[in-house]
Design a protein with these regions (language model features):
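Structural signal for the C-terminal ends of transmembrane alpha-helices
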Residues: 23-31, 170-176
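Membrane-interface anchor segments at the N-terminal boundary of transmembrane helices
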Residues: 112, 118-184
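Membrane-interface alpha helices of multi-pass inner-membrane proteins
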Residues: 1-11, 21-22, 42-46, 50
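Membrane-proximal stem/loop segments at transmembrane-domain junctions that anchor or position
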Residues: 58-136
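Membrane-interfacial entry segments at the cytosolic side of transmembrane helices
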Residues: 29-41
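Transmembrane-embedded, aromatic-rich helix segments that form part
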Residues: 2, 13-28, 65
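Transmembrane alpha-helix segments characteristic
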Residues: 2-4, 38, 44-45, 158-167, ...
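Membrane-interface catalytic loops of GT-C/OST-like multi-pass glycosylation enzymes that act
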Residues: 8-13, 17, 55-58, 148-151, ...
Length: 201
């Protein structure tokens, strides 16, 4: 639980992984509500200094202020599997109009969150297709990379070999093992999160 709290502070999306983990613990490992509540309490104690700091400084209960930007970075008109972060004139104007006060970080994030949400709603097919491409690229390799050194065998073959053997391992794994099934679940949840929010590094 302490590690979970630290992970939340490092990566905001880890909250989703923790929620899934608690549900899995409850339904498959039969962990009691009391024990899960205790784990949540330890997590809250771990992150409480940061939460208190945000309440005091910006009057807001928040863990991360980069959710909107990360979502936009992976879901904007110029975004590709490996990037393409171009801020258009209208978005630049919105950013420039944000008041330079203690709420700047929150409002900056909101501008990108609103724009990313608008992009996805207005063109769901494009972003679903992009999500699928990123998912396959994170799972295997990027077949449309523009980097000249990407397709050097020493670069892509280890990643491809690891991906293929991992999938074979998943297929052949003991489906009755709750521990293995949990690891497989978290493996795919991580890929889904990164495919939705981020671009291929």
């Amino acid at each position: 639980s302490f590690i979970g709290g630290l992970s939340i502070l490092l990566r905001g999306e880890f909250i989703l992984i923790l929620l899934i983990s608690f549900l899995y613990l409850f339904f498959y490992f039969k962990i009691t509500i009391k024990n899960i509540s205790l784990m949540i309490l330890i997590i809250l104690i771990t992150i409480s200094p940061y939460l208190i700091r945000n309440i005091v400084v910006i009057d807001t209960i928040t863990i991360t202020k980069s959710l909107g930007y990360n979502l936009w970075k992976g879901n904007n008109p110029s975004s590709l599997v490996e990037g393409g972060v171009i801020i258009d004139a209208n978005l630049k104007k919105e950013i420039n109009n944000i008041p330079k006060d203690k709420f700047y970080g929150i409002n900056f994030n909101k501008v990108f969150l609103d724009r990313a949400t608008e992009n996805i709603i207005n063109d769901p097919i494009r972003y679903l297709t992009l999500f699928t491409k990123k998912f396959m690229s994170f799972l295997f390799i990027d077949i449309h990379s523009s980097r000249q050194d990407y397709y050097k065998p020493l670069h892509y073959l280890p990643a491809l070999l690891l991906a293929i053997t991992s999938l074979f391992g998943i297929i052949l794994s003991d489906k009755k093992s709750n521990k293995l099934n949990y690891l497989i679940l978290i493996y795919f949840v991580n890929i889904i999160i990164f495919s939705f929010f981020f671009i291929l590094p």
